[in-house]
Amino acid sequence: MSALATASGSPRPSLRAPRARKARRYPLRAGAVVDVIQDGPSMAARIAWVSARLMIRPALSVGSYLPSAPWPWGVVEFAARAITPPPGTVRAGIGLVHCTAQLVRAAAVLPADGTRRVVLYLHGGAFLTCGAHSHGRLVSMLSSFADSPVLVPNYRKIPKHSISDAIDDCYDGYSWLRRKGYEPDQIVLAGDSAGGYLALALAQRLLECGERPAALVAMSPLLQLATRPKTTHPNIGSDAMFPPRAFDALHGLIARAAAHRDADGHSDALYEPLDHLQPGLPPMLIHVSGCEVLLHDARLAAQRLATVSVPVDVQVWPGQMHAFQLAAPMIPEATRSLRQIGRYIREATG
């Protein structure tokens, strides 16, 4: 049994026999890595980078000294309820086994009826915070550009729950889509930051179950829990948001949450997706800032996926802050990034 099965429970049986897969149109060879450097930052992007450097990074620096303090992580998602979605956006609440989810579609996007395509979006937030509302504008724009409904699980979070609980919730979101009538090659897994980790871990669990989604999309993904490669990365000085100590603090929270989880009488083992890559995973698109620390994770993932013959496309955006797509449409590069991702999703699903 794989490490993922040990950490997240035994692989569940395939939900339905997969149908014959359609040929994809995007021109990526198995094992190929496409690494594209985008244009430099706009004035809006520079202002956002400076703002994050002056406000978010100091706050995370202070918080990293007391990571176990009772910080009000839920405030971010609660406050985000005040953010209005783009006009015409349709949102519907969905009940999953252990959490809720939000089914989102932009104006003119057809309902989720099991036809065409659908995106399972796993939001970021360091496994600690955020949700469907904090990522509402990003998700609505992605729905528009991909011409697809998007399901966003409000998965369980640390420190009360473990990452394995979050993966279980993401699996339940995927299962809901399958019961809705979608085939694996109609479903794209996407996520930003910690959501990138969840998307890759979910794809690995699905592979064990004989299911292969159409594609994986990750924005500024956290794909490796180990801290030293990031705290010693050259970008640690140019990252707008994350001080070195933040990664150590997060790792400690993750480890403690895993130790407290009682899965079949055993505590969780920390799972590193990049140490368990296998052939057969979906092709992957990664968008990442050229000056953030998680550029390390993006390029390491690309190298390792290529060794197991999984096509990878890495788009590097110089001068951007972490998960800059959240600032769309205020930052033009964020809109361009989401438009490219939407096109990739349309091509991946035919």
What does each model-identified segment do?
Residues 1-109, 260-262, 350:
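A glycine/proline-hinged amphipathic helix-loop "lid/cap" segment
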Residues 99-350:
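Alpha/beta-hydrolase superfamily serine-hydrolase fold, recognizing
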